[in-house]
Amino acid sequence: MDKKALKVIADAMLEKKGQDVVSLDLKPIGTAISDYFIVCNADSTPNVVAIADNVEERMIEKCKRKVIRTQGKENAFWVILAYGDIVVPVFQTPYRAFYRLEDLWADAERTAYED
């Protein structure tokens, strides 16, 4: 897995005002469903959708990678984009606080991204 994709995803999230962008390196944790999670939150449904759409567009444009599966765009309380080795959850702020995905993998190496 190339770190370029994580940077492209983080930049795409930040371009559309994603908040608290954090990636988790799950490779050392043998039970994880992917190598990386990169998560953020936003304050509104339109913002969640805009972030997810921008991630998809930037990954095609800069990494030549299409999303394998998308879930959650119907109600957009959260949207998950699956790229196989990378899972990209985008939450509305209260849902991120409720699900606390980062706490599931507290041992994972974390990287925070900022503008």
What are these regions (language model features)?
Residues 1-33, 42-79, 93-94, 104-115:
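Polybasic/polar functional segments that serve as interface/processing modules
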Residues 81-83:
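Active-site beta-strand termini and strand-to-loop segments that position acidic
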Residues 97-100:
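Switch/connector loops and helix/strand junctions flanking conserved nucleotide-binding motifs
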